[in-house]
Amino acid sequence: MIGYVTIGTTDMEKAKAFYSQLLEPLGAKVIMDIGRIAFIGSGMDQPMLAVCVPYDESDPAPGNGNMLAFPAGSREDVDKLYAKAIELGATDEGEPGERMPTFYGGYFRDPDGNKAVFYQMG
């Protein structure tokens, strides 16, 4: 249903490095890079994350109420991936834990301030 989600960045090289290293355990890598925008994922036929310098050249701004959500595979993987995000320069928005019955997640903001979560349902 979702082809890709785009987030803005002020530093393409830093954003590509952050997300390709962070999402590598999930099988993701930079699969297309055309300078101003790069797509990170496991294949062109799978959902992707795109990082880009805004087309209008204005500063990117994280949205209020927007969040990237990455399925981690297990609670242990949530813990590992959250820790890796922090190690790569993300800031904490909520350490891994159970948020409601059947939902376990760890929240962070990437170096550009975009909010994200690694989660496990069930």
Q: What is each PLM-predicted segment?
A:
Residues 40-80:
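Long, continuous compositionally biased terminal/linker segments
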Residues 21, 25, 29, 71, ...:
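Charge-dense, helix-prone N-terminal extensions
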Residues 7-48:
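Core segments of cupin and vicinal oxygen chelate
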Residues 1-16, 68, 121-122:
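N-terminal beta-strand motif that seeds the catalytic metal site of vicinal oxygen chelate
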Residues 1, 61-64, 100:
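Short glycine-enriched loop/turn motifs at secondary-structure junctions
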Residues 15-19, 85, 113:
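Conserved active-site tyrosine of GNAT-family acetyltransferases
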Residues 86-122:
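Vicinal oxygen chelate
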Residues 38, 66, 102-106:
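Short beta-strand micro-motifs in enzyme catalytic cores
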